[in-house]
């Protein structure tokens, strides 16, 4: 089975599911392929990774750190220069791998795994499940700062901001490089009255507007109750905030 990860025209975007895409600066890598063994008899199992560059270069290597389940959910984080690939794990933190050889450059150690990853110029923002947002030095993996949150993940909005349910029933727009909140909403405000629904898509539409969508399961055999809301975010209206 091959899992292909393509990159968007404007951003280097790696896809798990469409609703969980992650945004990165346009970069050197064009495509990543994961080839999983047909028979898996042990865990963790080796995955063959093919990294294709826009220059035409292509490298193939094997690793046990890049888990397909995570790729499907959260994508593959890479640096814009194409030198590093970041591998999330369920229990053992975050790995930084050489994109051309698969060699381990550094890893973080924690009791919780890592879900989303946002790659900046000299830092990485990652989420430790439902514990904290962490800023890491991109060269060493050293923790620069962290902020406690209750959610299991975040959504990248553009080159600068993320959206996160930082506390129960409280959504925040956070500047990735500083972990500072620039806009805060109650769950009712953020979903425009659908606070008991599950939010599964947040997109920045430009001009300070967010598109928020979600659903609520129905237990009577009927289709899910779905909603879509347009939410104003004045803090993202300025040209600088557009990223």
For each feature predicted by the language model, list its residue ranges:
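Short glycine/acidic-enriched loop and turn motifs that connect beta-strands
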Residues: 20-21, 39, 169-170, 216-221
